[in-house]
Design a protein with these regions (language model features):
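Short catalytic-loop micro-motif centered on adjacent basic/acidic residues
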Residues: 59-64, 90, 154-158, 178-181, ...
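Conserved, mostly hydrophobic/aromatic
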Residues: 9, 19-21, 61, 74, ...
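Structured C-terminal cap/extension of enzyme domains
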Residues: 9, 54, 192-290
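Short hydrophobic/aromatic-enriched beta-strand-loop microsegments
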Residues: 84-88, 175-183, 269-277
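Alpha-helix-loop-beta-strand connector modules within alpha/beta enzyme cores
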Residues: 71-90, 140-151, 206
């Protein structure tokens, strides 16, 4: 396959690959383990996954402060898997006390062993109070703006598992450059939020399309039949990526081979309309059956 296509990531003006490497499945643990407890086997697998991503053009790597050992392990791996086009993103949750938020931000930079993040997301604006903690005067966003002024953070966005109206309100605040949100074939209710992000010229990053999109990495036999001749991962990726409001989707790879079906989807993107239509009709017939 040729170089992975990119899309303009909204007003960030970054050219972001259609596939992003999500760092929530290749780490050893969901606990932030001490360095001495991370095994060589786990680290070798993470580095192999990262290197395959680099080789195939997944230049955007995304993790989070509360993804267990992910930040620490990536901090070791990134210098060993060099990428001149890398875009690094992490996510830190809002706090009632901005000093607590800044302390976690410092820890993210320490774990990742980096001097700058291209992208920082406020992690989990799921309730109105999370948005208020972020945007109020002297809140968490003021910390981010200071770090941006110091050149340590490029662009700021937010991630969310919250209701559509809250996501839309967060987009319409004008404070964020991009959004990480759920939207895929089996869950299209966030479409108004995609519209709001487009209207604000925000980058749009679809999170967890394989897991929350229907546990597509372990599909049922019935799901395989409904998506035939496509794998469910390929079908869902094509559904997401054919929408111009979407700029990139997360690939939460646990090992190098987990990239394969997503790469297949991108290679068939020009055929998306013809490939998706018969599968969608099959789903519609299934849903209409008594």
């Amino acid at each position: 396959m040729a170089a992975l296509p990119t899309r303009r990531f909204g007003r960030t003006e970054l050219e972001i690959p259609l596939l992003s490497l999500g760092g929530m499945r290749f780490q050893q643990s969901w606990t932030d383990l001490p360095a001495g407890e991370i095994t060589a086997e786990s680290q070798v697998n993470l580095e192999a996954t990262l290197q395959r991503a680099v080789d195939r053009g997944l230049h955007h790597v995304e993790t989070a402060r509360h993804y267990g050992s992910s930040e620490r392990q990536l901090g070791w791996a990134l210098p060993r898997c060099l990428d001149d086009h890398r875009l690094l993103q992490s996510k830190v949750p809002p706090r009632a006390n901005p000093a607590d938020f800044e302390a976690e931000l410092e820890l993210t930079f320490e774990r990742l062993n980096c001097q700058r993040l291209d992208l920082l997301a406020i992690h989990g604006i799921n309730l109105p109070e999370h948005l208020e903690q972020t945007l109020r005067p002297s809140g968490c966003m003021d910390v981010v703006r200071r770090w941006q002024a110091d050149g340590r953070i490029g662009h700021v966005g937010f991630s969310t598992h919250g209701p559509t109206d809250l996501i839309t309100a967060s987009c319409n605040s004008g404070a964020f450059d991009y959004v990480n949100l759920h939207w895929y074939y089996i869950r299209q209710d966030n479409s108004p939020a995609l519209d709001a992000a487009r209207d604000q010229d925000m980058g749009v990053f679809i999170i967890s399309p394989t897991d929350k999109g229907g546990h597509l990495h372990t599909p049922s036999q019935r799901l395989l039949e409904l998506c035939d001749p496509l794998h469910p991962i390929v079908f869902n990726d094509l559904f997401c990526l054919r929408d111009p409001r979407v700029h990139t989707i997360s690939v939460g790879a646990s090992c190098p081979g987990d990239l394969d079906l997503h790469l297949e989807a991108v290679s068939r993107l020009d055929e998306a309309a013809d490939l998706i239509a018969p599968v969608s009709r099959g789903f519609s017939r299934q849903l209409s059956m008594p």
